[in-house]
């Protein structure tokens, strides 16, 4: 496959609202649209096609070895006037395969993502830890980018991001933004995060809390007066707290819970759901903000499970919300269908019963 043909494929994919493009030998390209993976009506790709795509993408990356030595590699790829793409190149059945995720040129706003005002207010925090959680492909990177944009447009600060790879490209507005990528700019999240503390940041974005060392340094950064933004692969606030605590030895758990209680300012847990129109996906989110009660739930491991109920009862007071509350709102406003809302709810039968009483 020639590079021009590949770029045309990417342009068509973006035009059709594709989130991911899959390429492998022996099958036609496939596009993930509204969460469904759909084959393109073209002939199956040959091994030389996927090899050619891997080759010209790698020529613009930091890969310096022989193509034949590559087994797995993360990089990015850009097409002018089309967009940027996060790219994973790998082998399957001895041949090259690729998955590319579309990253729009334009950085989203909190409003454009359909998130409530409380998310925008999180950008006003001067210190602490804010976490975006959800499964792969739940829109965490977009929400992080929207929060960074909000800070950038309203605050004179130094925002330092550590990403693998860099996704959204930010331009300096009121803030000064430094974007570092694992590989060409630094060797790991933990190394870059440790160095960041000597680079006079006000806000630090860490692409992912991958290991205990990164979590520890992020907590220290929050404790020393920085606002730290990051992601965790968990599905709600309670599970996020447990995941962070369990990353440490058992004897450290009580101390970590107290540190999280003092420094964890917010958790946004997301899912992407197909819209009722069949075009695009909507964000459904559980949102936790720090309160005295939340601090107690974090410290007491036997009460952490109470967080979800607390969030649903204090929406009008603190702007918090449970998943089911947001799902109900999305259904009533016609954004998603009842079947989609029920399937995504904590308990489908309870969810439908609750709707009947409203």
Give a label for each model feature:
Residues 1-358:
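Short, flexible helix-loop junctions that flank or precede catalytic/ligand sites
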């Amino acid at each position: 496959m020639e590079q021009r043909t590949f770029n045309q494929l990417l342009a068509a994919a973006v035009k059709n609202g594709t989130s991911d493009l899959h390429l492998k030998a022996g099958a036609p390209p496939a596009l993930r649209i509204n969460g469904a993976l759909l084959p393109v009506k073209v002939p199956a790709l040959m091994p030389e096609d996927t090899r050619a795509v891997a080759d010209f993408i790698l020529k613009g990356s930091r890969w310096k070895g022989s193509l034949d030595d590559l087994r797995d590699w993360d990089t990015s790829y850009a097409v002018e006037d089309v967009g940027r793409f996060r790219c994973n190149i790998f082998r399957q059945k001895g041949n090259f395969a690729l998955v590319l995720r579309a990253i729009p040129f334009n950085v989203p706003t909190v409003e454009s993502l359909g998130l409530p005002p409380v998310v925008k207010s999180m950008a006003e925090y001067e210190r602490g830890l804010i976490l975006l959680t959800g499964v792969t492909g739940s829109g965490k990177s977009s929400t992080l980018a929207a929060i960074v944009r909000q800070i950038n447009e309203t605050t004179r600060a130094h925002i330092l991001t550590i990403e693998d790879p860099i996704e959204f490209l930010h331009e300096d507005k009121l803030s000064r933004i430094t974007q570092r990528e694992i590989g060409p700019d630094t060797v790991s999240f933990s190394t870059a995060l440790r160095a960041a503390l000597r680079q006079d940041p006000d806000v630090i974005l860490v692409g992912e809390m991958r290991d205990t060392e990164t979590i520890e340094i992020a907590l220290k950064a929050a404790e020393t007066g920085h606002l730290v933004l990051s992601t965790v692969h968990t599905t709600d606030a309670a599970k996020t707290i447990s995941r962070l605590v369990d990353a440490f030895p058992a004897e450290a758990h009580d101390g970590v819970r107290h540190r999280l209680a003092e420094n964890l300012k917010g958790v946004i847990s997301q899912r992407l759901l197909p819209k009722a129109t069949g075009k695009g996906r909507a964000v459904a989110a559980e949102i936790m903000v720090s309160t005295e009660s939340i601090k107690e739930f974090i410290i007491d491991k036997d009460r952490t499970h109470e967080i979800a109920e607390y969030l649903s009862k204090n929406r009008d007071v603190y702007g918090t919300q449970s998943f089911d509350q947001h799902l109900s709102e999305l259904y009533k406003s016609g954004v998603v269908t009842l079947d989609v809302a029920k399937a995504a709810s904590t308990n489908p039968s309870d969810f439908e019963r609750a709707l009947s009483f409203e």
